Amino acid sequence: MSEFNNRPRLVLLPAVDVADGKAVRLTQGAAGSETSYGDPVDAAAEWADAGAEWIHLVDLDAAFGRGDNRGLLKRVIRQTKGVKIELSGGIRDDDSLEHALEIGATRVNLGTAALENPEWASHVIGQYGEAIAVGLDVRGTTLAARGWTREGGDLWQVLERLEEAGCARYVVTDVTKDGALKGPNLDLLRQVVERTERPVVASGGIASLDDIAALRELVSLGVEGAIVGKALYSGAFTLPEALDVAGH
């Protein structure tokens, strides 16, 4: 056990996905597959109280282009002082990006905009540096855009372009794994970290403490952290248990 404890730690980001004012989880990113878990402010406060250093906060309505939850996101961030927030969903222009940073997001994930508006993405990557991550949402090696409803190009071509732009960090999601509780796509993560020196955050599929241990094995290769969603909400394990396995 001591050998395991000497390994570098994996940063865990409990997820709070917001749709129609409620904390929800989707299955494979599909609109209409929501399971509701109540008030997002309460959910975020619960993870903060349980020891979270980061929360991955997602505005699903903004991601799907059906309005937004800006006021509610601001409340979530205000109620979780001391916890760093990675904010995602519908960040597609200067207004949405600046608003996310103004309300207290530590880091903002670009998704669709990085695929559909590469010049703008390159500009803000250069301007904001570490405050920008790019979400690479993948089916096979094809990227998914617009709330995962459209194809967004070849993963490796887009990654090469983002590397040239100086992207500071990538959040890699296997869409087929997300919310399915079937384990993360370790092979995909290994392939991505082989192609970048930048840190990678893994997302999608974590179902057990063994999955967290397996992801921790990849930290030395470049996997910095992991987003944990449905497994926490469904009670597969507690956040303190997960943080312990992750090395906190």
Swiss-Prot record:
It is found in: Cytoplasm. Its main location: cytoplasm. The keyword Isomerase applies. Disulfide bonds: none annotated. One of its GO terms (molecular function) is phosphoribosylanthranilate isomerase activity. Its EC number is 5.3.1.16. It is an enzyme of class 5 (isomerase). Belongs to the HisA/HisF family. This is 1-(5-phosphoribosyl)-5-[(5-phosphoribosylamino)methylideneamino] imidazole-4-carboxamide isomerase. It comes from Leifsonia xyli subsp. xyli (strain CTCB07). The gene is hisA.
